[in-house]
């Protein structure tokens, strides 16, 4: 994704000249009042200030963001409100004439925005060919800054201003406009009040179009160059990391325009994610089902580019070999390693590397059910591993009868939620392959959940509704525009080998979470960690994520949106259900007496086929 850096100036005499000045100073978009030259606030002005022909149609759409007249369509005064609405609708009509798919920016003045919301709702319906509406919101209530200069402010006044949170202004409008993908938020920073970390984190879960940085936020460094203070650098960096564009707001006579643009372009370069998988951000994907579907070579290739995972598997096998075979037995004792699912060979390489590093003798059995993967593995046996004691079997591990039992059983059957690729069922079925004192790598997996706010993910779920029951699915997603309402907590645990007399892989658990700030619940995040051997672990739990590992994206279980209040406790109940043909999850927010929708009953949406 390419970012834009926008120059915002009011009171300009010429939009083409503003564009020329902006582009000469390394900006690629401009923002200014739709009423350049200060058109009087008369709804039926007969003398327009500029014609449509001063720019081409493509330039109107790609280079200009219009700010609407600063009128209050929600004024408590009837006459002022009606007059404001006429002016506002005149501006909207002019903008639609100039920009059939352009961008309009309107400022929220306070919590009362019902009329504005109804206008935006009408203009953003699916059958209406409009562009985007950018809702400009201060990151904190501007009223709070005034108390720093007032000695007469009472505690009640301060508390009231703190409770009048601009996020709620935005949220109320967003709810009325039904989470429209055409309605995005533009967050205005201010030099009078720096937001808390939790405030910033919450905004990251919103569909952010841009942040506005006023020129007053810049300071001169020792080289007399315009920069942001360290605290603001960090805040701006967080927004850049979720693809927020930058709008620099200045007065028309500012002489440091180029310095501002160059500086924020450097911030963008320093903070944007250049990872090879960033094109998957916020995409919803149906989880793989490798037990019943054969993976293609592209999928294998993506997994194999993760060096961290296979290095940790190698470390685990290495440690197990050292524990299993003493130095005195190294040249004589053979360790049988059984690999459940060979893919294109990365785990086999990890086993051979571990054997070489420990100087232990191994015999490797590779059990792989994918006939296409077998072809690649067979070629590797002939060309790369001709000197190895390795044997390939084209079998389902649950139906395989081994020539001998394994000392170490290695598998890579974990999904984004730990057990969602049916590792318990697979490893239970493969238990007969392992010696009574054999080692399973991994030997334990734990799933985790937490409540999430993500307007972008919710919008993506809603776009799938016409085709299938999208709120009854769990998705794999590279979570980007999210707010963690509370930290993840452990859900289900599975231990291997499971030698219980009656194995039951169904589960049910209720987990409670605290709401730290007013927000909206859009769904449930799902993660896992696994212990490979002893203290060697892999994790995608945000609290303990294995550095540099990207083989697994988290899961996202959708819910209907609900506004939550600071201090509230919510409980989430999760089920893992099993029948003769499938495994599935069900989930529900259980806040008595107002239990929310029960999702994926009987696995009618997302399920894993046995």
From Swiss-Prot:
Localization annotation: Cytoplasm
A Pfam family matched in the record: PRMT5_TIM
InterPro entries per the UniProt record, alphabetical: Arg_MeTrfase, Arg_MeTrfase_PRMT5, PRMT5, PRMT5_C, PRMT5_TIM, SAM-dependent_MTases_sf
Ranges for domain SAM-dependent MTase PRMT-type: 284-587
Residues engaged in binding a protein: 303, 412, 421
Annotated Gene3D superfamilies: Divalent-metal-dependent TIM barrel enzymes, Hnrnp arginine n-methyltransferase1, Vaccinia Virus protein VP39
Region (Interaction with vls): 470-610
Keyword Ribonucleoprotein belongs to the record: no
Binding site for S-adenosyl-L-methionine: 300, 309-310, 368, 396-397
GO MF annotation list: histone arginine N-methyltransferase activity; protein methyltransferase activity; protein-arginine N-methyltransferase activity; protein-arginine omega-N symmetric methyltransferase activity
GO cellular component, one term: nucleus
Tissue expression per record: Expressed only in ovaries.
Keyword Methyltransferase: yes
Major subcellular site: cytoplasm
Knockout mutant characteristics: Flies are viable and do not display neuromuscular dysfunctions. Strong synthetic lethal phenotype in the presence of a hypomorphic Smn mutation.
EC code: 2.1.1.-
Catalytic residue positions: 412, 421
GO biological processes: intracellular mRNA localization; P granule organization; peptidyl-arginine methylation; pole plasm assembly; pole plasm protein localization; regulation of DNA-templated transcription
Source organism superkingdom: Eukaryota
Record note on quaternary structure: Interacts with vls.
Role summary: Arginine methyltransferase that can both catalyze the formation of omega-N monomethylarginine (MMA) and symmetrical dimethylarginine (sDMA). Specifically mediates the symmetrical dimethylation of arginine residues in the small nuclear ribonucleoproteins SmD1 and SmD3. Required for arginine symmetrical dimethylation of piwi family proteins, piwi, aub and AGO3, during germline development. Required during oogenesis for pole cell formation in the pathway controlled by oskar (osk) and for abdominal segments during early embryogenesis. Involved in nanos (nos) and germ cell mRNAs localization.
Annotated family: Belongs to the class I-like SAM-binding methyltransferase superfamily. Protein arginine N-methyltransferase family.
Full protein name: Protein arginine N-methyltransferase 5
Species lineage: Eukaryota, Metazoa, Ecdysozoa, Arthropoda, Hexapoda
């Amino acid at each position: 994704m390419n970012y834009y850096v926008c120059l915002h100036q009011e009171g300009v005499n010429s939009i083409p000249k503003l564009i020329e000045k902006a582009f000469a100073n390394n900006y690629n978009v401009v923002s200014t009042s739709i009423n350049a030259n200060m058109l009087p606030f008369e709804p039926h002005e007969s003398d327009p200030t500029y014609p449509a022909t001063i720019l081409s149609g493509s330039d109107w759409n790609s280079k200009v963001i219009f700010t609407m007249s600063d009128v209050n369509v929600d004024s408590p005064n009837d006459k002022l409100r009606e007059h404001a609405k006429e002016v506002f609708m005149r501006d909207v009509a002019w903008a639609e004439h100039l920009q059939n798919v352009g961008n309009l920016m309107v400022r929220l003045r306070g919590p009362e925005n019902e009329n504005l919301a109804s206008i935006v709702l009408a203009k953003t319906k699916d059958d209406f060919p409009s562009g985007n509406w950018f809702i400009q919101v201060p990151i904190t209530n501007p009223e709070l800054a005034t108390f720093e200069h007032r000695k007469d402010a009472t505690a009640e006044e301060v508390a009231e201003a703190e409770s009048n949170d601009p996020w709620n202004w935005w949220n109320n409008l967003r709810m009325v406009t039904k989470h429209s993908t055409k309605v995005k938020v533009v967050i205005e920073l201010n030099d009078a009040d720096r937001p808390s970390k939790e405030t910033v984190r919450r905004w990251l879960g919103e569909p952010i179009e841009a942040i506005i940085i006023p020129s007053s936020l810049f300071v001169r460094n020792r080289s007399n160059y315009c920069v942001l203070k360290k605290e603001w650098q960090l805040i701006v960096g967080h927004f850049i990391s979720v693809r927020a564009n930058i709008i620099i707001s200045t007065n028309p006579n500012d002489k440091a325009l180029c310095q501002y643009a160059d500086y924020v372009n450097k911030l963008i370069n320093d903070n944007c994610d250049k990872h090879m998988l960033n094109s998957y951000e916020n995409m919803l994907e149906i989880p793989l089902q490798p037990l019943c579907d054969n993976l293609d070579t592209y999928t294998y290739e993506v997994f194999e580019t993760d060096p961290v995972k296979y290095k940790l598997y190698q470390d685990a096998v290495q440690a197990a070999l050292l524990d299993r075979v003493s130095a005195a037995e190294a040249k004589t004792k053979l360790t049988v390693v059984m690999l459940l699912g060979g893919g294109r060979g990365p785990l086999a390489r990890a086993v051979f590397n571990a054997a070489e590093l420990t100087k232990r003798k191994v015999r490797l059995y590779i059990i792989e059910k994918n006939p296409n993967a077998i072809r690649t593995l067979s070629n590797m046996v002939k060309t790369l591993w001709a000197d190895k004691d390795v044997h390939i079997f084209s079998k389902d591990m649950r139906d395989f009868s081994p020539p001998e039992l394994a000392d170490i059983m290695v598998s890579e059957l974990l999904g984004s939620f730990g057990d969602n690729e049916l590792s318990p069922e697979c490893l239970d079925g493969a238990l007969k392959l392992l010696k009574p004192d054999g080692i399973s790598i991994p030997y334990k997996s734990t799933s985790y959940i937490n409540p999430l706010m993500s307007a972008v993910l919710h919008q993506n779920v809603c776009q799938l509704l016409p085709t299938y029951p999208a709120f009854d699915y769990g998705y794999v997603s590279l979570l980007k525009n999210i707010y963690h309402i509370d930290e993840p907590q452990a859900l289900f645990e599975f231990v291997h080998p499971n030698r219980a007399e009656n194995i039951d892989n169904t589960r049910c658990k209720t987990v409670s979470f605290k709401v730290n700030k007013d927000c909206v619940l859009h769904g449930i995040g799902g993660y896992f960690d696994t212990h490979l051997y002893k203290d060697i672990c892999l994790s995608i739990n945000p609290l303990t994520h294995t550095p540099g590992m990207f083989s697994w994206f988290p899961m996202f279980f959708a819910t209907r949106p609900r506004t939550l209040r600071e201090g509230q406790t919510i409980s989430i109940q999760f089920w893992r259900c099993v029948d003769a043909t499938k495994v599935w999850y069900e989930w529900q927010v259980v806040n008595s007496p107002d239990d929310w929708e029960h999702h994926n009953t009987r696995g009618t949406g997302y399920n894993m086929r046995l």
